[in-house]
């Protein structure tokens, strides 16, 4: 028997003893005539001294209260953890554990992806349900390059198609400028190349009068200005889009 169960047993015995001393059973009440015939000595021996009875009663009450107070601070026993619940969540990921991103590093799994289906939702998902939904959607929209030895992953199928042309050598976007025979695997590469023929420089520096064919060239130049801020280029791009 554990210590906590033993304390409960002793407290129960004390309370039962107190109730037995306080209550007088009905069948134990003898007629007045028979009580008068009992010798005074036997009555005194049966009931004892009232002072001793009161002392015993107070002692039992004190012990019972102490045991009940100790029982309040009994530590709660935690259930033992099953060894099956300690399995690594990576075992359920399958082939996703060796998938690499464009930077060459393994993709990190968010808490929502590592969470078991039967477990309770995390506080983050309760406070921000959109974050959990976004992470789940991103995990379902992975497009891995099928080329042997590559293993790059893209969020959009169009990006994967453009990347796959690097392996196949396909260039479906030819330049339409007269006497130009260049071809490109991506449409944005063709657009940038076409500006070399037209001389178009639509990206103007917000701090000076210089213009550039490519936005990355503009950003590289604008950072040389001491008063440059990235929001300046965003505003200039928005104004250009509205003008077109």
Curated annotation (Swiss-Prot):
Q: What CDD domains does UniProt report for this protein, alphabetically?
A: KLF9_N
| GO BP field | cellular response to cortisol stimulus; circadian rhythm; negative regulation of keratinocyte proliferation; regulation of transcription by RNA polymerase II
Organ and tissue specificity: Epidermis (at protein level).
Q: Which Pfam families match?
A: zf-C2H2
Zinc-finger (C2H2-type) residue ranges come to 143-167, 173-197, 203-225
Please give the subunit comment from the record.
Answer: Interacts with ZZEF1.
Would you identify the family this protein belongs to, as annotated? Answer: Belongs to the Sp1 C2H2-type zinc-finger protein family.
What's the protein called, per UniProt? Krueppel-like factor 9
> What is the originating organism of this protein?
Homo sapiens
Q: What gene is this protein translated from?
A: KLF9
């Amino acid at each position: 028997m554990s210590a906590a169960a033993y304390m409960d047993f002793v407290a129960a015995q004390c309370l039962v003893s107190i109730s037995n001393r306080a209550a007088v059973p009905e069948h134990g009440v003898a007629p007045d005539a028979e009580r008068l015939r009992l010798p005074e000595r036997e009555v005194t021996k049966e009931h004892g001294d009232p002072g001793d009875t009161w002392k015993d009663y107070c002692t039992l009450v004190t012990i019972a209260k102490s045991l009940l107070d100790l029982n309040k601070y009994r530590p709660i026993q935690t259930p033992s953890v099953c060894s099956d619940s300690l399995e690594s969540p990576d075992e359920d990921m399958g082939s996703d554990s060796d998938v690499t991103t464009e930077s060459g590093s393994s993709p990190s799994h968010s808490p929502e992806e590592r969470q078991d289906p039967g477990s309770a939702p995390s506080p983050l998902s309760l406070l921000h349900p959109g974050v959990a939904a976004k992470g789940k959607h991103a995990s379902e929209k992975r497009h891995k390059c099928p080329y042997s030895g590559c293993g790059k992953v893209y969020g959009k199928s169009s990006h994967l198609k453009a990347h796959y042309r690097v392996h196949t050598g396909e260039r479906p976007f030819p330049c339409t400028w007269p006497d130009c025979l260049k071809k490109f695997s991506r449409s944005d590469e063709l657009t940038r190349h076409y500006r070399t023929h037209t001389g178009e420089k639509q990206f103007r520096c917000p701090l000076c009068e210089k213009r550039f064919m490519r936005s990355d060239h503009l950003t590289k130049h604008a950072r040389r200005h001491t008063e440059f801020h990235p929001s300046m280029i965003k505003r200039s791009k928005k104004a250009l889009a509205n003008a077109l």
